């Protein structure tokens, strides 16, 4: 038996959730057991820049970008499951990290 862990990351949580729903439906159609999606903590990255190129250091502007992520575990993955995952057409802004683990 093989266990597959999918970690999905995106800047937009709506696009991420649509991709998660597509993956869950494909895995359930192939007959594998699934755990998740587990929402992971949102990571925020802040950038502070000066508004003026020359003076007024007190005048600054802050920008923030948020990283949303979900975790999906596929228990007892079959070759049909892997084929259905490879054929999925996910949004280009979703980053998918796949980890394969052997279970006893």
Curated annotation (Swiss-Prot):
GO terms for molecular function: structural constituent of ribosome; tRNA binding. The keyword Disulfide bond does not apply. It comes from Helicobacter pylori (strain P12). Belongs to the universal ribosomal protein uS10 family. Pfam families: Ribosomal_S10. Keywords: Ribonucleoprotein, Ribosomal protein. It comes from the Bacteria. Part of the 30S ribosomal subunit. Gene3D superfamilies: Ribosomal protein S10 domain. The keyword Ribosomal protein applies. This is Small ribosomal subunit protein uS10. GO terms for biological process: translation. Involved in the binding of tRNA to the ribosomes. GO terms for cellular component: ribonucleoprotein complex; ribosome. SUPFAM superfamilies: Ribosomal protein S10.
